[in-house]
Amino acid sequence: MSDRIRVRYAPSPTGYLHIGNARTALFNYLYAKHYNGDFVIRIEDTDKKRNLEDGETSQFDNLKWLGLDWDESVDKDNGYGPYRQSERQHIYQPLIDQLLAEDKAYKCYMTEEELEAEREAQIARGEMPRYGGQHAHLTEEQRQQFEAEGRQPSIRFRVPQNQTYSFDDMVKGNISFDSNGIGDWVIVKKDGIPTYNFAVAIDDHYMQISDVIRGDDHISNTPKQIMIYEAFGWEPPRFGHMSLIVNEERKKLSKRDGQILQFIEQYRDLGYLPEALFNFIALLGWSPEGEEEIFSKEEFIKIFDEKRLSKSPAFFDKQKLAWVNNQYMKQKDTETVFQLALPHLIKANLIPEVPSEEDLSWGRKLIALYQKEMSYAGEIVPLSEMFFKEMPALGEEEQQVINGEQVPELMTHLFSKLEALEPFESAEIKKTIKEVQKETGIKGKQLFMPIRVAVTGQMHGPELPNTIEVLGKEKVLNRLKQYK
């Protein structure tokens, strides 16, 4: 194990970057950067059936978008490569041969049907399913007989009996496993491909990984990996297992849970900001001192302390994510937010696919109107429905406002002045409303609320003069005249 902090994020290229995996990558990144160490990305691609053609590219693209810059990987070899497991067979094979030669591993010829029958029988007896060791001591004659039958062997690790495997987890504290509860497990599958627990231990050792930080669904893998380290006389890395991420029902976040968007790609498509998502994910199972919740990446690196990783499950709060992103949206200049929102405006046919300067100018005004309210760039479409949909039927409260005694007088004066107004801009509209106030004597809520309800159908919203400008003269006059 290296004295220098070296951590790794090791995804399989089987799909988009999941929130849970993004958190694993992010905490490893913060830990490495806090201690001036190395953040390594290794691709665990030995499951060829599940690998997607663009799975690896997607992982790297989304990690880069989040701001997780790696020090080593397939594109940055620092002497510890190859960084794809599929390219490391030449490293694994001599070690497999060594374990076989030292009788620390053996060939198992049992078929899938035989193993399944054993498993079902154990479950029927109320026992924990585990391999019973039927082929742990085959004679050479028995091995030859199985091979003559055409059976392909897997290779199993010979688990030492009556031994306790313990490790001091940086999150959970001391964790122990009794080896008698772990059957001899497969280190090489029948197709010759090393299994996860074997390959990952070998890779972590040869890449001099100092700390393995991952989700607590990997706790049960840890004793098997420690066995591999001990079999070769190597020092294991330090381990840290992060708490689960749970949904509103406090159930483990599942990829089948349709209530929560779970892939970074989905948040990108909606127009979330990478620094906001970074901020939100960094607080899933970790907390800083104090009450502050908004930090830059550099601030997170400075204050990160692995001792503050939580043992309790981390709640994925959709409202909290929306709030965090809104804080960042408010800080951005309008042009940045407009460029993020533009594809959404085009998709909703609010702006033509080939927009004119006039279209773009209108779009910028629309964004300026809603920027402080927006949780994400794509939200501009539902927020601004009044600009492109028919006026909704008024609710009871809105009806009371618009049926006020002074409303016809108010609308008549306002309609007349706005009809003649040029240029139709917010500053001039504001002056016009003040003139109407002086002429009619109507003021306060009796002035502003009926105007807002008449032109938007809503009781509340952004600055009224700005809203009227963005709606445009024709639409505003059409909406006002029915209340004259």
Curated annotation (Swiss-Prot):
The keyword Transmembrane helix does not apply. One of its GO terms (cellular component) is cytosol. Its EC number is 6.1.1.17. It catalyses: tRNA(Glu) + L-glutamate + ATP = L-glutamyl-tRNA(Glu) + AMP + diphosphate. GO terms for molecular function: ATP binding; glutamate-tRNA ligase activity; tRNA binding; zinc ion binding. It is an enzyme of class 6 (ligase). A motif ('KMSKS' region) lies at residues 252-256. Keywords: Aminoacyl-tRNA synthetase, ATP-binding, Cytoplasm, Ligase, Nucleotide-binding, Protein biosynthesis. A motif ('HIGH' region) lies at residues 11-21. Pfam families: Anticodon_2 (PF19269), tRNA-synt_1c (PF00749). It is found in: Cytoplasm. GO terms for biological process: glutamyl-tRNA aminoacylation. InterPro entries: aa-tRNA-synth_I_cd-bd, aa-tRNA-synth_I_codon-bd_sub2, aa-tRNA-synth_I_CS, aa_tRNA-synth_I_cd-bd_sf, Glu-tRNA-ligase_bac/mito, Glu/Gln-tRNA-synth, Glu/Gln-tRNA-synth_Ib_cat-dom, GluQ/Sye. The keyword Protein biosynthesis applies. It comes from the Bacteria. ATP binds at K255. Monomer. NCBIfam families: gltX_bact. HAMAP family: Glu_tRNA_synth_type1. Belongs to the class-I aminoacyl-tRNA synthetase family. Glutamate--tRNA ligase type 1 subfamily. Catalyzes the attachment of glutamate to tRNA(Glu) in a two-step reaction: glutamate is first activated by ATP to form Glu-AMP and then transferred to the acceptor end of tRNA(Glu). This is Glutamate--tRNA ligase. It comes from Staphylococcus aureus (strain Newman).
